[in-house]
Amino acid sequence: VDIAIVGTGYVGLVSGACFAEMGITVYCVDTNAQKIEALKSGVIPIYEPNLDHLVLRNIEAGRLRFSTDLREVLNEGDVIFTAVGTPPDEDGSADLSYVLEVARTIGRNMQGYKLIVTKSTVPVGTAEKVRATIAQELETRGVTIDFDVASNPEFLKEGNAIDDFMKPDRVVVGVDSDRAKELMTQLYRPMLLNNFRVLFMDIPSAEMTKYAANAMLATRISFMNDIANLCEKVGADVSMVRQGIGSDTRIGNKFLYPGCGYGGSCFPKDVKALIATAHQKGYEMQVLEAVERVNEKQKNILFEKLSSYYQGELKGRKI
């Protein structure tokens, strides 16, 4: 199965290189011509351990190719992954304009069956919007071509992304047809042969799983920061408390370290998007809204402690 991946950011490039390493011919597409020319030369725009070697090896093997035009590679394979950005709108919801623009391009140019797989982090219902967008373009063209949509969210940790892809805890795949399931099974066959868990489910559940996972991890971080602040008030040692609760196999040790709050490119955006999705459906995510409030407050605590320690005189201090 040959595939195209639209978007050569963190998710798209790591996914493309890893699929190529599994023996699949991958066409990575991005509208940024400068980035594509750099990638063709083996210049990687992001840092991820061993990614540069993986990209170069698969370029030389002819399995990893780059293009600025989705129309050129659209009909090279049956599966197209969407890994474009979904930045937050003003209300915190995910902006799907890039995802739907890819869908429009596919609908305008596809000549035969395609499986369109969303790898970007997107709200529940996005696959149906992609389906409707492609169907509208096909109707405008006056043609009838079969296609399927699917969801295959990524669960990559920065600094460990290649291992996370090649040796995953699980691979989540949302499909709603036997043909789509068979194609995704072919793609992930090496992982199935190595007994890695590939979890097939309905598409809305797959879309929700990504948000729920990140929201759960963000919740643990805010919870431990709240506990750390209380420990300080009552004279307890939060590191001892962390060991005590982390030793419980129902809880475990991961994401139990207090600090200055969660950040980065995923957790804040995804928590806001999940809260926004709930609001759109008339539901209040009380726990997640508290998680967000704790996190916003936590950002200031370190600076408040510094200011208190130096009695407000921070100018010229070496921290």
Protein language model regions, located:
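Structural/interface elements that position substrates and couple domains in central-metabolism enzymes
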Residues: V1-I319
